[in-house]
């Protein structure tokens, strides 16, 4: 059941991101796409937190803090990218963050391509 709910959230995020990409096009920064995506989540009644500050831990000690672009329903992290393309390093970074905050699934969304680029981690 949890996997089905997570898949539904992933689909909702993907559809919202596609709508933002279709309407805004290319050339903006992550702040602008983030604002538009938050607005689209609101229109679609998708529960989210934006710029959620989390503590990164190492062996029980706080190793630093990180602001997540979005957390959807306390189970899905969404990271926004506006680079030329998503890289293995983008994926590795999100995996490390997920591990540090004890979450399992994340999406990296790149708005700077003609075709929206999304990777699931």
Language model: regions and residue ranges:
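Interdomain/boundary linker segments immediately adjacent to catalytic/signaling cores
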Residues: 1-24
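Conserved beta3 VAIK motif of the Hanks protein kinase fold
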Residues: 78
């Amino acid at each position: 059941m949890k996997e089905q709910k997570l898949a539904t959230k992933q689909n909702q995020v993907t559809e919202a991101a596609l709508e933002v990409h279709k309407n805004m096009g290319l050339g903006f920064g992550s702040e602008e796409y983030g604002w538009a995506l938050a607005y689209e989540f609101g229109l679609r009644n998708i529960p989210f937190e934006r710029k959620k500050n989390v503590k990164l831990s190492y062996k029980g000690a706080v190793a630093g803090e990180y602001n997540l672009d979005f957390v959807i329903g306390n189970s899905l992290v969404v990271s926004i990218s506006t680079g030329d393309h998503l890289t293995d390093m983008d994926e590795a970074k999100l995996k490390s963050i997920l591990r540090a905050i004890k979450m399992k699934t994340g999406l990296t969304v790149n708005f700077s391509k003609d075709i929206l680029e999304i990777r699931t981690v």
